[in-house]
């Protein structure tokens, strides 16, 4: 009787689920018409900008290509490449035609790309020239044609296809179909039901093997209309898209929500190092920043921590009234560094370091932390920055339901389970995995462990798959220990593993900082890490004591959302 009791506890804020009334495809038809002359997409560092009208015209050209090739609704089209205007255009051309888009992260290895393209049964592939050069044509025999994300030219066509010939005559085809020119009145996309699958999102997750998440128009509309209702972005505002668009988080808000409301999207198109990002923020001056903890934590560690750790600063921060003035100066400096115009910074995709969260809250920096997963396209919970509770992962959305698999969901950690508008249809061609991830009564098992409060705020403790059970029966969440260790001197990344019933910390040191200070010697490194281990064990419980720190030679391999692929390191032996 546990689950019905839990449901009663949350009945006061859960709404009944019903199909999102706004049609996902029509959101973009309406946006193109209403924002025809406004700037839509700009590739960072380039002069060219597509207006909403020009994007609609490019989509019309691709639709003519699809029609020429007798592409059917429900056929799959893969896209792999960096964030660019044409990436966005290819995505929207696919879904507004009624085909299913299959975005692939550009840092996936060729064998993974082959697997996804083949498993999804993709007909066409849009990609960059250099990525195509590294793929094996013979391994992708199901593809009819491949198109460049640089200029949409045909890079490859299967024997017997005449795609290249049609592409050369595209202007003539446009004149034939739109003899008076292409205008907003010519946009009339098929109103495909929101129930239809429109996206297959493959992710390696933390189990090491990709599953194709079937996302419907309703799932996408749920995320986008939530962004519209809460006014995350408005017509004429600006965003900088630097998270990979093939990942659900960046795609939903930097791209899909932004395009639905008439926002100007600048696509970074390069690796978002802190130096590149700061320059781009200064130039673009975005009205909203969507990011992951890794970016914010690097800014904190490289910019803020050295400042507040100075002896004079520590002294000043202990003086009443003066501390508030200093915090205000730090806040202003940070806001200015990020462009100065944003309403808030939304952080998601992985766990945030509690020390960083507490400091940002203390200086009243406008940030919030959301929670989601690919299977929810991705949003589960969010609260605006002025309502955000430090330590939480936001408040459950009004179009979602949540329950905790626990006898006392307010106080005792249990698995977080959700249902609602954003929850996927299942895994493509994988009924077994679909059955495993849903409960018998239809709730999605997130695999995350946490609690919830009376107002619907979610508090995440860790992953059920990573939790370690101590010898005395205590639950150990390695992420909580790692967050403390990562704040210590010269620790760039860490990973807690269990070895012979003891906890061991794998650490990738900050060699760059060690080199700059002339401290990169085995003796110095051992001294620093011994001190870190001693200080770490003072901060954790008796059952969480770490037996040793073992240095790791390279950065840890990560998933698309920048979580460490833990399964690769569980069997790491002693040095």
Locate each region found by the language model.
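Conserved pre-ATP/AMP-binding loop-to-beta segment of ANL
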Residues: 36-37, 167-202, 209, 232-238
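Conserved ATP-binding/catalytic segment of the ANL
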Residues: 396, 403, 410-411, 415-470
């Amino acid at each position: 009787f546990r689950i019905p009791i839990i449901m009663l506890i949350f009945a006061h804020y859960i709404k009944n689920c019903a199909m999102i009334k706004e049609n996902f495809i029509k959101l973009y038809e309406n946006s193109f018409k209403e924002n025809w002359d406004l700037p839509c997409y700009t590739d960072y560092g380039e002069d060219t900008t597509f207006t909403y009208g020009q994007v609609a015209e490019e989509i019309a050209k691709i639709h003519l290509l699809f029609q020429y090739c007798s592409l059917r609704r429900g056929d799959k089209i893969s896209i792999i490449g960096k964030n660019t205007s044409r990436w966005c255009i290819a995505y929207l051309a696919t879904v507004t035609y009624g085909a299913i888009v299959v975005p692939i992260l550009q840092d996936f290895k060729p064998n993974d790309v082959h697997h996804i393209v083949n498993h999804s049964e993709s007909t066409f592939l849009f990609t960059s020239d250099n990525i195509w050069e590294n793929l094996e044509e013979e391994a992708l025999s199901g593809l009819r044609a491949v198109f460049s994300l640089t200029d949409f030219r045909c890079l490859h066509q299967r024997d017997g296809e005449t795609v290249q010939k049609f592409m050369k005559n595209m202007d003539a085809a446009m004149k034939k179909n739109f003899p008076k020119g292409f205008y907003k009145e010519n946009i009339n996309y098929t109103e495909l039901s929101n129930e239809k699958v429109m996206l297959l999102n493959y992710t390696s997750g933390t189990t090491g093997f990709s599953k194709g998440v079937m996302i419907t128009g309703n799932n996408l509309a749920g995320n986008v209309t939530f962004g519209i209702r809460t006014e995350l972005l408005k017509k004429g505002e600006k965003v900088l898209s630097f998270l990979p668009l093939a990942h659900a988080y960046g795609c939903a808000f930097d791209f899909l929500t932004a395009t639905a409301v008439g926002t100007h999207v600048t696509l970074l198109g390069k690796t978002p190092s802190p130096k590149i990002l700061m320059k781009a923020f200064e130039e673009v001056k975005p009205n909203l920043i969507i990011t992951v903890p890794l970016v914010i934590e690097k800014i904190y560690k490289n910019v803020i921590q050295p400042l507040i750790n100075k002896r004079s600063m520590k002294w000043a921060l202990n003086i009443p009234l003066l501390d508030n003035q200093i915090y205000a100066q730090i806040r202003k400096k940070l806001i200015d560094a990020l462009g100065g115009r944003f309403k808030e910074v939304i952080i998601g995709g992985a766990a945030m370091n509690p020390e960083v969260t507490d400091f940002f809250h203390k200086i009243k920096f406008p940030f919030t932390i959301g929670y989601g997963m690919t299977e929810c396209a991705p949003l589960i919970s969010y609260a605006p920055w002025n309502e955000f509770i430090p330590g939480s992962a936001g408040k459950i959305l009004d179009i979602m339901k949540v329950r905790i698999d626990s006898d006392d969901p307010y106080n005792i950690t249990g698995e977080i389970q959700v249902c609602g508008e954003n929850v996927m249809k299942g895994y493509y061609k994988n009924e077994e995995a679909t059955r495993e991830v849903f409960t018998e009564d239809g709730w999605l098992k997130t695999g995350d462990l946490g609690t919830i409060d009376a107002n619907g705020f979610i508090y995440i403790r860790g992953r059920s798959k990573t939790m370690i059970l101590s010898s005395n029966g205590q639950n150990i969440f390695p992420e909580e220990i790692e967050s403390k260790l990562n704040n210590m001197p010269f620790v760039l990344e860490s990973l807690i593993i269990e070895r012979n019933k003891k906890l061991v910390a794998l650490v990738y040191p900050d060699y760059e900082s060690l080199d700059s200070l002339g401290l990169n010697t085995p003796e110095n490194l051992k001294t620093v890490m011994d001190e870190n281990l001693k200080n770490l064990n003072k901060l954790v419980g008796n059952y969480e004591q770490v037996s040793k720190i073992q240095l790791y030679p390279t950065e840890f391999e990560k998933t698309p959302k920048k979580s460490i692929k833990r399964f690769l390191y569980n069997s790491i032996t002693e040095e």
